[in-house]
Amino acid sequence: MKLLTKEQTRSLGLKVVPIIGSLIIRLLSLTNRKKFHAPESLGEDNFIMACWHGQLFMIPYAYTHFRKDPKVKLLISEHFDGDLIARTLSFFGFSTIRGSSTRGGVKALLQGIKDIKAGYDLGITPDGPKGPRHEVHDGIIVMAQKAKVNIVLVEIKPSKYWQVNSWDKFVIPKPFGVIEYFISEPIDVSTMGMDDAKKLIKEGMLKHEF
């Protein structure tokens, strides 16, 4: 029996994993009770949504709590795991911008600003794609200030979960529990210095750390 090459394995994975992943996300949403701690509305203005890399699994349901018709792009790395995430989220109506702090960063930054000005919301993992965990990189602040939009912080806290032994301690909810979504009021960082803005975002995203 001929074994698959690395390229063939990846190609197969890109076709199969996103389908299975999207089904699992929907199943876990259906089998968990959802509690939202959030403003009544985020208004009509578009925004940047920030979520830690390790809490990304259930992000579609945080966003669609406010936006029933998704018009959002997520900044996703150009690595293979970024391919898997991008294809999985496409099943929820999410588009992506490919790039990170290490690969395609400037291109992604400029594209993100352009898309925000065109009316898209933008999703960013401030500590992605490779950490350090819970450290806010400059990109989210630069984008918010250049595009003149506010930042909305999202924390996702399941009552029962599996945790992957990875740099981001990636969290996957277990079924038959409660998933709490903590969503902040829009935060204006337009007049703040870089260090102060990053500190504000980090502290806001660690209020319900578990």
Q: Predicted segment positions?
A:
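A short, well-structured juxtamembrane/interface segment
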Residues: 23-45, 57-58
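Catalytic core of membrane glycerolipid acyltransferases/transacylases, capturing the structured
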Residues: 45-103, 147, 163
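Non-catalytic C-terminal accessory region of glycerolipid acyltransferases
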Residues: 1-23, 27, 91, 106-210
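Pocket-edge structural micro-motifs
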Residues: 36-38, 51-53, 76, 185, ...
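A generic local structural motif
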Residues: 34-39, 61, 109-111, 167-169
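A short beta-turn/loop motif at secondary-structure boundaries
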Residues: 40-42, 104, 174
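General small-molecule cofactor/ligand-binding pocket signal
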Residues: 35, 97, 182
